[in-house]
Amino acid sequence: LAVRNALIAYQDNAWMVVTTGKGSALVFYPFPAADHNDAYSLDDDARQRARELAATVVRVGRVGAASNWLAHASPNSLRHVSLGGHGNGTRVMWGDGRCHESDRTCGLWPNNKAFLSLLASRLTERAVVVLESCYALPLAPIVAESLRDGARVFATDACYNQEHLKYVLDASGDLVPMLFDPWHTSSMQVVVAPDCHDMPWVAPEWLRTLGVTGCADVTMDVCLSDDADGEVLDRKGQGPASACCRCGAGRLM
């Protein structure tokens, strides 16, 4: 029993720094034992993303390990956090390749409230959180509900190839994830912490024909549109990049 308890304690605290960045970005990835197809190996694409974010990349085996790492970060210090691991819409898998199917300490499950609360305390205002996992969109509202200060949670409802995940600069000055999928089978969607409220913006006529009437319908493609060309501005000169929470704007309550 003592050996078993010691092993569990080790697994809970096991982490490994893969790359050290000088920015305010943190990426959690699983250990190779929980990565059956090497999706989270540090290949050229992953290293390029880490360089762009100036991110520290840490491999974790348990929620406890991720929590221990976050606990050492200063409050309000992280502008970007990626939670990477295989998924099926119910959790982000870390673990050892076996336990994460049912053990709630091995992967990031919706009821990991202590971890999400700790994460919220470490984020800056309007931080970006990426669920870097297949089929993770159902988790995004749950994660966003636990956050504050206009944090944006990005996720997709499909499975995707990691080489298609790229970061682009949005109008708020943040690097946000996009999926450049040549088959257009997946896209990143965004859910915002509940304390952010949209400012008035009425979409121009050409956008309304595409089903976008205001901030509630905005997609990241609209957020990334250039306000300077006037194509997304309303009659009052307001654009989504300065009005909509999904675009990193809006009013914080």
Show where each model-derived region lies.
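Second-shell loop/turn segments in exported
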Residues: 31-37, 128-133, 230-234
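Low-complexity, serine/threonine/proline/glycine-rich extracellular segments that form mucin-like
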Residues: 74-78
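Active-site or metal-binding loop neighborhoods of secreted/extracellular toxin and effector enzymes
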Residues: 1-22, 34, 113-118, 127, ...
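A domain-level signal for caspase-like cysteine endopeptidase catalytic cores
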Residues: 1-73
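Compact disulfide-stabilized, cysteine-rich extracellular microdomains and processed peptide cores
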Residues: 193-253
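Catalytic cores of nucleophile-dependent amide-cleaving enzymes
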Residues: 80-166
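Extracytoplasmic/secreted envelope proteins and their assembly/folding machinery
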Residues: 43, 63-70, 113-120, 140-144, ...
